[in-house]
Amino acid sequence: YIAEKVKQSEFSLSQEEIRPYFPLPKVISGLFAIVERLYGIKVQEHSESVSRWHDEVSFYQLFDADDNLLGGFYFDLFARSGKRGGAWMSGFQSRYTYAEQNHEQLPVCFMVGNFTPALDGKPSLLTHDEVLTLFHEFGHGLHHLLTQVTVSDVAGVNGVEWDAVELP
């Protein structure tokens, strides 16, 4: 609250005035471009190939530079009736190797937000704080998805104390 008031006072700028500069589709494509540049991984949408609990939920898969599947994630980014408030990442399935069957279970996670949905054919517009939230939760998702640890109890964020998970 105070920080927002200082921004308004010092810079005559509010979060609401910034929204038009952050349409969600462009923020997501920019986020994916950064991830590809930094980590050499590609993010591809595959929403139609999986079951989803709501039409606004999307599903993506991550691939390395050699097109090997690394894992997948769901984006459930919009507020709706009956949905818990806030933003978070939850691991659904951790990386795990079944040595006896020579099989590797790939990680899957959910990244959840409560952004304002698109209205009247116009895209969802984010505040700067919401952009930061999306990047923050996506960072947790990458931690879960890109782990090389193959024991699910300690793979990704599972092996990190909760107070340390939020340090970055």
Indicate where each model-derived feature is located.
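Active-site-proximal, well-structured secondary-structure segments within enzyme catalytic domains
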Residues: 1-114, 164-165
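Alpha-helix N-cap/helix-initiation motif
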Residues: 20, 24, 123-131, 154-158
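Glycine-rich phosphate/pyrophosphate-binding loops
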Residues: 145-156
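Active-site recognition of the HExxH zinc-binding catalytic motif
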Residues: 35, 117, 122-145
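Post-HExxH zinc-binding segment in Zn-dependent metallohydrolases
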Residues: 150, 159-168
